[in-house]
């Protein structure tokens, strides 16, 4: 069995943002030499997310609006977590909704996506460096 573990680093300017990381992950799958297996892509921070969806700007904007309606950043004192001196409770909630990781099958050496599927890094408390783990295993 082959395996590859790599770290990706992101520093998104601004509080929130989405980064399409599909191409980067595809290059790592090729580097791994795995033909049949699994690829885990995991946000290693509690205010960031990895998720799969369509790479369409309108949809990404809709996510931004929807998440802000569900867990607005302000007023920050609405959250008990922020009463400890933090100001990012909304980011924790947004991450919980969007998820921590994705696992994608590798078939014939390629990520086996459905139509339009892409992998995204979601940042909800930006302006600092954060890590994503990519682990690929298989034959």
Q: Which ranges hold each PLM region?
A:
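Active-site histidine-anchored catalytic micro-motif
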Residues: 1-139
């Amino acid at each position: 069995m082959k395996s590859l573990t790599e770290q990706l680093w992101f520093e998104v300017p601004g509080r929130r943002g989405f980064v399409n990381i599909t191409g980067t992950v595809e290059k790592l799958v090729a580097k791994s030499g795995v033909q049949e297996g699994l690829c885990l892509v995991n946000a290693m921070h509690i205010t960031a997310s990895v998720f799969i969806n369509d790479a369409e700007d309108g949809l990404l904007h809709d996510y931004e609006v929807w998440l802000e309606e569900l867990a607005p950043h302000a007023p920050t004192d609405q959250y008990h977590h922020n009463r400890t001196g933090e100001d990012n409770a909304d980011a924790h909630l947004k991450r919980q909704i969007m998820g921590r990781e994705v696992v994608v099958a590798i078939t014939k050496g390629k990520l086996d996506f459905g139509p339009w599927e892409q992998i995204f890094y979601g940042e909800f408390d930006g302006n600092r460096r954060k890590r994503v783990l990519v682990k690929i295993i298989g034959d």
